[in-house]
């Protein structure tokens, strides 16, 4: 992959756009821009404009930034639900191997929860589903949390979201693995009071 090859795959209105493209490809990386160009080409635009490519990049970046914030809120919420339930008495907490290992050092349930990776937290949540019976649909919780974990991983690695593949999740009894469904999955894993604001912020990403 060569710098010039990426530049030559886009069309420019003027020399200023070309210089801007050179600047941002150097800052953000050739691979990232190539992914976006490939995505534009896959939608029947064989020679996308730099304006279109850079617009997609900014849209994707805003989407990733907002998803990151709200997905962190989901993680905090799940930790809080378990911590609030078992902080004073963890005798009924079904503990995973990783939780047991880390609790030996941190003692407190809440402090131990903070040390768990997302994957480890999800394992603990699924072992203690009944804590969330008034919040989530327990029948779809495992598949939806798995999809959540995969999306979180894509975002953490700063991947171009529109070109990625995702896991299936279930929204209103419909199952799909599209980015749109995975974003909706984040919404329904949030506490109720965050959902309207989340939808507003996601819709604003297009602006």
Predicted regions and their residues:
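Extended intrinsically disordered or low-complexity regions, especially N/C-terminal cytosolic tails and loops
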Residues: 1-151, 162-207
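Acidic/aromatic/glycine-rich contiguous surface patches that form carbohydrate-binding/processing clefts
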Residues: 158
């Amino acid at each position: 992959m060569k710098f010039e090859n990426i530049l030559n795959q886009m069309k420019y209105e003027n020399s200023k756009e070309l210089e801007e493209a050179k600047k941002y490809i150097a800052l953000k990386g050739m691979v990232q821009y190539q992914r976006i160009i490939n995505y534009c080409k896959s939608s029947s635009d064989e020679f996308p404009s730099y304006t279109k490519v850079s617009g997609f990049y900014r849209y994707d970046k805003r989407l990733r930034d907002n998803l990151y914030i709200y997905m962190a809120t989901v993680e905090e919420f799940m930790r809080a639900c378990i911590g609030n339930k078992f902080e004073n008495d963890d005798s009924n907490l079904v503990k995973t191997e990783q939780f047991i290992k880390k609790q030996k050092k941190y003692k407190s349930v809440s402090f131990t929860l903070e040390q768990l990776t997302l994957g480890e937290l999800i394992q603990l949540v699924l072992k203690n589903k009944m804590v969330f019976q008034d919040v989530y649909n327990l029948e779809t919780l495992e598949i939806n949390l798995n999809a959540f974990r995969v999306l979180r991983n894509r975002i953490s690695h700063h991947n171009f979201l529109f070109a990625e593949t995702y896991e299936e999740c279930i929204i209103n009894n419909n199952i799909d693995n599209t980015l749109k469904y995975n974003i909706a999955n984040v919404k329904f894993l949030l506490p109720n009071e965050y959902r309207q604001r989340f939808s507003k912020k996601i819709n604003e990403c297009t602006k």
